[in-house]
Structures are given as structure tokens and as C-alpha cells.
Amino acid sequence: MEVWYGAEQVPASLSAPGGPGAVVTMGIFDGVHRGHQAVLGRVVELSHELAHGDRRPLAVAVTFDPHPRSVHQPEADLPLIASLTDRLASLGDLGLDAVLVITYTLDFAAQSPQDFVRTWLEELLGARAVVVGDDVRFGWRNSGDAATLEQIGRQDGFEVEIVSTICSDEGRRWSSTWIRQCLKDGNMRQVSRVLGRPHRLRGVVVRGLRRGRELGFPTANLEAA
């Protein structure tokens, strides 16, 4: 999977006449949980469905860093489930061709929904189709939603597919908020359930109090990265 940090790293051939174009989704994808995986999996499927011979649109996810809430509400001190490095690693496990990482700033956030879609998805990525969850919000003050995207798609000639909310057996929506609460509560079994895989923790091994030698098996102290 390729990672493009900013528009300048996106190959011009992607959206050029005769280029493959892309099937695109967009989101923070903090944790890359089961709900995210449903949308991302459909992106990969649709990219193959739209292939003609050996010409296939790339399956591309657009994500943002830093987290928008940390830009708009820096005092909130939002705990992230995963670093950008771990987020990209999880995205790379899903069969995507590329991820575009956009630096999120207040200037970027000031774009209208129409400007965002046309500048970044259509002109830059050559979007042939856009796949999103039914709770998608984008553009100035989150004024764009699924209906907005469908309207732009009809006007500009690209396909839009809305993936319905995916819920647990008890009817709760898989979400990053749920994972953060489980992490706060120390409920790692539930964290793994919502993620659909074990939770990753990255850090540097540091010297501890050497109590592990008293337990009869090796231990490691991690300083969270």
C-alpha cells in the first residue's frame, strides 16, 4: 500500500485523461474498527467491480492528521486510539492500494463540501466512485452529509455508495467513542471485539523495578509512544 502525504505526492497519472482514477472513501479511521472495515472493504470490492481488463481504479482512503477535534477544540485533549503510524498499518491490512494523508488545519476546514469533493476527490484523485458510511460529515462546519455527496455525484458524474451503519449483536453501533470508553474502563476484551482484532500498543521498553524476575517469567515495561 502506498502512502501519500499531501497532494504533491499523488501521481498526476491517477486523474489524468485515460488514467485509472480511484474508488475513494474518507474519514479519520481512528482505530480502524469493524464499522470502518465495512466501508473500507466495500471500497476494495468496488474497485475490482469497476475494472475493465487490466485497468482498475485504485482503492484509496483519505484520512486526516491531526484529528480534527484536536484542531477545533485543543483544550479537549482527545485521547487517540491509535497513532497515525498504527492507523496506516491497520489500513494496510485491508487491501487498499493507497492512503492519502491530508494535514488538517483551520484553513482546510473552511472549504465548502463542494470545494472539498471537487478539489481533493475529483481533480486530485480522479474519483470514479465514493463510498462512505451513512453518518459521514465533511466540509465547513460539517455541513456536508451523505445527501450532499450524492447530489454532487449526480451533478459531476461519479458514483456514490452509502454503507449503512454496522452494529453489534446487541444493536450498538461500532464506534471509536465506544472503544475509548472501553480503554478508559480497562475492558480490553471488549476493545478487541469492537476492533475485530487485538489492540496494538506501541512504545519503548524502559527499565523498571525489576520485579519480573520475582515472578518467574520475563516482563517488559513500555513507555507509550
Regions found by a protein language model. Name each.
Residues 9-13, 106-110, 167-172:
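A short acidic, often aromatic-flanked loop/helix-cap motif at beta-alpha or helix-coil junctions
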Residues 118, 122-225:
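Active-site cores that bind ATP or allylic diphosphates and position pyrophosphate for catalysis
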Residues 68-156:
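N-terminal Rossmann-like or analogous alpha/beta NTP/dinucleotide-binding catalytic cores
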Residues 64, 104, 165-166:
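Hydrophobic pocket-lining residues within nucleotide cofactor-binding pockets
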Residues 17-26, 34-98:
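Active-site rim/loop-helix segments in enzyme catalytic domains that contact anionic ligands
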Residues 2-4, 99-102, 159-163:
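General small-molecule cofactor/ligand-binding pocket signal
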Residues 30:
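Catalytic acidic motif of RecA-like/P-loop NTPases
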Residues 1-22:
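Positively charged, low-complexity intrinsically disordered leader regions
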